[in-house]
Amino acid sequence: MAMRLILFFGALFGHIYCLETFVGDQVLEIVPSNEEQIKNLLQLEAQEHLQLDFWKSPTTPGETAHVRVPFVNVQAVKVFLESQGIAYSIMIEDVQVLLDKENEEMLFNRRRERSGNFNFGAYHTLEEISQEMDNLVAEHPGLVSKVNIGSSFENRPMNVLKFSTGGDKPAIWLDAGIHAREWVTQATALWTANKIVSDYGKDPSITSILDALDIFLLPVTNPDGYVFSQTKNRMWRKTRSKVSGSLCVGVDPNRNWDAGFGGPGASSNPCSDSYHGPSANSEVEVKSIVDFIKSHGKVKAFITLHSYSQLLMFPYGYKCTKLDDFDELSEVAQKAAQSLRSLHGTKYKVGPICSVIYQASGGSIDWSYDYGIKYSFAFELRDTGRYGFLLPARQILPTAEETWLGLKAIMEHVRDHPY
């Protein structure tokens, strides 16, 4: 009987959500040993019929790459790797097993929250996140307000939390969830919002930061993609805009900014996960942020949260030239990474995007830096590849807590170095 019930609920769940499943899909960790093997992997990536999803692209020999391989192609890919002498191991045995666990935990948490408080250590739907944002505003009207900066392609509101002690101050911008499947980022942003209101007036650091600067926080930058990743396809990364002349949907919003648009590290193929879109700012989610920042006129720091890899990066990504502010940004990032590490020992790699990961054009912090916002940083949160995008909910709180120390170090520097 119990088994029949489980099967029934499983079928029901799948039916309600028409969830795409990933039964038998594996994530392989691949270690290319030379340039030749990297070339082979890039050719493999280009084979569209294999439907490979590179979670972490092959960049330099000796550096790991991660790829999700659909069940039907697992054998073929392994045979190819072996024939080329490319070392690999299985990072995730069966992706669906992790997804089922994640789903189960969300359902369990939803039941628990009905009779209790909001649990910041769980993944939530967009609706639940919006509700909690409203609660924060209602509970701390003197410190937090909600600013609507636009609507997504599917007409969901893009709501920013504004933390301010009044007056027209210079500001810090912080966003998360520009890539839909990076769930730990939206969760971390929401925890951060709660942390700011809890600690203001108690923690001298955040108190003095907010006495000098406003903070604008956008917890879900890509709401359509987020909803889609929860209801249809957990691996979804892009927006949900319609691309004319293509059956494929969506644009990679972090290749859509007006910074080296259409250059290396972005794809002109609408079916690619890193498709840059028809033109810079074609995505309303990106354009809304650009318009808001331009009209505000006094944003001094632009920080974006991604996952995963444990990196803290600054510009440039679209070119590999050294910034004028390289020394200062490098120092700030090193300091932030040290603060972050002090809590749980989590190690972050620090440097410009181009050298830390790869050349990638059309990214948000390259645009913000070129626009004149000196303190532009991108975090890639936990982990380094045990779970990748499917970070278990039990790691949300430690991730958010340590990230907060890094964020605070950056904000303190911005506070002490007005320009």
Curated annotation (Swiss-Prot):
SUPFAM superfamilies reported in the protein's UniProt record: Protease propeptides/inhibitors (SSF54897), Zn-dependent exopeptidases (SSF53187)
MF terms in GO: carboxypeptidase activity; metallocarboxypeptidase activity; zinc ion binding
Catalytic site: 380
Its biological purpose: Carboxypeptidase that catalyzes the release of a C-terminal amino acid, with a preference for large aromatic C-terminal residues.
Cofactor: Zn(2+)
InterPro entries documented for this protein: CPA_M14_CPD, M14A-like_propep, M14A_act_pep, Peptidase_M14
PROSITE patterns: CARBOXYPEPT_ZN_1 (PS00132), CARBOXYPEPT_ZN_2 (PS00133), PEPTIDASE_M14 (PS52035)
Species in which this protein is naturally found: Homo sapiens (Human)
Residue numbers covered by the propeptide annotation in the UniProt entry: 19-114
Catalytic function, reaction form: Similar to that of carboxypeptidase A (EC 3.4.17.1), but with a preference for bulkier C-terminal residues
Phylogenetic placement of the source organism: Eukaryota, Metazoa, Chordata, Craniata, Vertebrata
GO CC term (a single one): vacuole
Signal peptide per UniProt: 1-18
Name of this chain's protein: Carboxypeptidase A2
UniProt keyword terms in alphabetical order: Carboxypeptidase, Disulfide bond, Hydrolase, Metal-binding, Metalloprotease, Protease, Secreted, Signal, Zinc, Zymogen
UniProt family annotation: Belongs to the peptidase M14 family.
